[in-house]
Design a protein with these regions (language model features):
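Glycine-rich, acidic/polar active-site loops that bind/position phosphate-bearing ligands
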Residues: 1-446
Length: 446
């Protein structure tokens, strides 16, 4: 038994914790949870807790359903939205096969494999995500979506519900050892953003799953609804999950070069080139729903075209401003992902794409200095700028032919995502929308 496991057993006994929740996700990124009694902890650490994997989306087939949950004791935290009188704790889990091998379909395991591949190449990856979401007043229905305020970007709303909400959410996140860089009101009414500090990729994905759950829990307790839907309003900005990435070789930031353009190293340029080369192929993972493409093609600074730029928020990849004496903070920002993505899979394909650029020494295309949305199709063509997929169907088609995504996800996850996303697109394509009825449901003129 390691020191983390011993710590968990002591904490559970000293604080009289009666319920321990074991968390993991399905392939779609939906959080799953099973509660165990403290008496089961030692067995869980030693052997894992059995469950029916075939009942969880994408994990396994019905004829090989037995799987194990192995708690990661380093993720042990109390749930701050639960009563102190009846404390509840949680740990994230790795999913194992009955013989103890990592389950190939476990999203957390997919990311762990890519992180190991980066480490084998000499790199330590750090990820800093921005999480955007809308706060709506209850009750919420498709016909009734009322934002909690009418504020805009960076607005301070005196005694505003968003201010109070963010303050409570940030305090709870930090109580769970999830470091927050900053929080603020975003561009849409009732839209907020909480930025988490850079940590290793697996912890970053764990933190996103925790943050989404915590934000939803805090909202419900305040008689609000938090939605991470990429584009809930036609007339307002969509919600993204801009993802900042950096690589370290030892203690040195591999993206930093004092002599490079924008202080960006050759390694950093190759990493960006890899992201751009595979952007269309990975879109079905970073932007996994039909609604995701209404954000990407709906304006509001969402990226629609495959290019990079310095400080250019119309670009897919942005190189943020370099601050003097801040070499360790050198990073790139990939702006396509949205908060409905499975963060484990999204981070896995982003890292894999960037590493491919480094391994193949890809050349980076010229920088896009203009607002890409204002350029004509001809101008973009001359600059070598092509579009991201316009729909989930286009994204799945691009992913289907991707050797990189197939190798990164593994056969089982890859095949499941293709099937599941095709099903989602087919169901959407068969819908008759209100707009169609309003436009076409009329008596044919005589």
């Amino acid at each position: 038994m390691d020191s983390h496991q011993e710590y968990v057993l002591r904490e559970v006994a000293q604080k009289n914790i009666r319920f321990i929740r074991l968390w993991f996700t399905d392939v779609a990124g939906v959080l799953k949870s099973i509660s165990i009694d403290p008496g089961e902890l030692e067995e869980a650490f030693a052997e894992g807790i059995g469950f029916d994997g075939s009942a969880v989306e994408g994990l396994t087939r019905v004829y090989e359903s037995d799987m194990l949950l192995k708690p990661d004791a380093s993720t042990f935290q109390l749930l701050p939205w639960r009563s102190n009188e009846d404390p509840v704790a949680r740990m994230f889990c790795d999913v194992l096969m009955p013989d103890g091998r990592p389950a190939p379909s476990d999203p957390r395991g997919v990311l762990e494999r890519v992180v190991k591949r980066a480490a084998d190449a000499g790199f330590r990856v750090m990820i800093h995500p921005e999480i955007e979401f809308y706060l709506l007043r209850q009750p919420v229905t498709p016909d009734r979506m009322i934002p909690v305020d009418q504020a805009g970007y960076f607005d301070h709303v005196a005694r505003g519900d968003s201010n109070d909400f963010r303050r409570r959410a940030v305090r709870m996140l930090e109580d769970m050892a999830i470091p927050v860089e900053f929080s603020h009101h975003e561009g849409g009414p009732g839209q907020n953003e909480i930025d988490l500090r850079a940590v290793d990729p697996v912890r970053a994905a764990d933190n996103i799953m925790t943050a989404r759950t915590l934000i939803e829990e805090v909202a419900l307790r305040e008689e609000l609804v938090a939605t991470f839907m990429p584009k809930p309003f036609i007339e307002h900005p969509g919600s993204g999950m801009h993802t900042h990435l950096s690589l370290f070789e030892g203690e040195e930031n591999a993206f930093f070069s004092p002599a490079g353009q924008y202080r960006l190293s050759t390694t950093g340029r190759q990493f960006i080139a890899g992201l751009l080369a595979h952007a269309e192929e990975i879109a079905a993972i970073t932007n996994q729903h039909v609604n995701s493409y209404k954000r990407l093609w709906g304006g509001g600074e969402a990226p629609s075209y495959v290019c990079w730029g310095h400080l250019n928020r119309s670009a897919l990849v942005r190189v943020p401003l370099y601050k003097p004496k801040k070499a360790a903070a050198a990073r790139i920002e990939y702006r396509a992902p949205d908060p409905s993505a499975n963060p484990y899979l999204a981070f896995a394909v982003l890292i894999a794409a960037g590493l491919d650029g480094i391994e193949k020494k890809m050349e980076l295309m010229p920088e896009a200095e203009d607002n890409v949305w204002d350029l004509s199709d001809r101008e973009r063509q001359v600059m070598g700028i092509h579009a991201l997929p316009a729909s989930l169907s286009d994204a799945v088609r691009a992913m289907k032919s991707s050797d990189l995504v197939a190798a990164t996800l593994g056969e089982q996850v890859f095949d499941y995502v293709i099937r599941n996303k095709r099903k989602e697109w087919t169901e959407y394509r068969h819908q008759i929308t209100r707009q169609e009825l309003e436009q076409f449901l009329k008596v044919v003129p005589r």
